[in-house]
Amino acid sequence: MKIIILTSSRYGTAAHHLPYLIESGTCEISMVILNEGRIKKNFRYLKNKVRKIIKIGPLGALNGIRMRKWFSHDISIYKEIEELESICYRYDIPFHSTPNINTRSTEDLFRKANADVGLSLGNGYIGQRIYSIPKYGMINIHHEILPDYQNAQSVIWQIFNMSSITGYTIHKIDKHIDTGDLLLQGTIPIEFMGSLRRTVARTSVSLLEASAIGLVKVLGDLDQYYTSAKPQGPGKSYTTPSIWQYFKILRNHKKLKEASDNSMYEKDVHKAAENVRP
């Protein structure tokens, strides 16, 4: 089976998952495409930006920009990820770039690749003109649980809702964001660290490792997963937190961290007691 990978990051999910796919031998990677993200700042773009700022507030918007590193650069503290183009060069995989996702350039590259299925790893909205080109369409990895956390950043909204569990979802791509039929889901515990920032970065590494294994599983038996795919049903969509929502996330993080520490302490005491011999 031939797959084409579309990504918007040189050091993100695609760079992490590509070695897993190569080593698994479950598929042939016909091409990797990097979206350079050259956004046309037209009226529609500016209108959407203003609408978002009104919704989450100027401080929320600025804080959102500050938090971006938590989900990208900070991951390197816990996991070294090789640059994507370097991996492609080493394994002789065709690597191309495109100015933006929904462009003629991307469309032409997809047709040239002639892949059976497309794989989206770390992208924004993908239009039908792109995702309908591969024989079996495209699939996406969303690092949260669907449909409850559509368009949500990993970990933070779980903490907002006082949950100590996060996860990933592999799903088909349709005309909306994070709404396609479900193929596979997995959950992991949030790894609470001394700060929210470190908690996000450390848990994101565990999410990457879990979703890479899940992706290999799906691609290894794609027909079966497509046959058993389930529609999502009603869901809830998220965006960047407002500054007040962020403060709530910080408070909840402190509570959940304390609960996690107490739980670990109790487990250690219980384990030590079991090891005591008369």
Where do the protein language model's features map onto the residues?
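One-carbon transfer enzymes
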Residues: 1-278
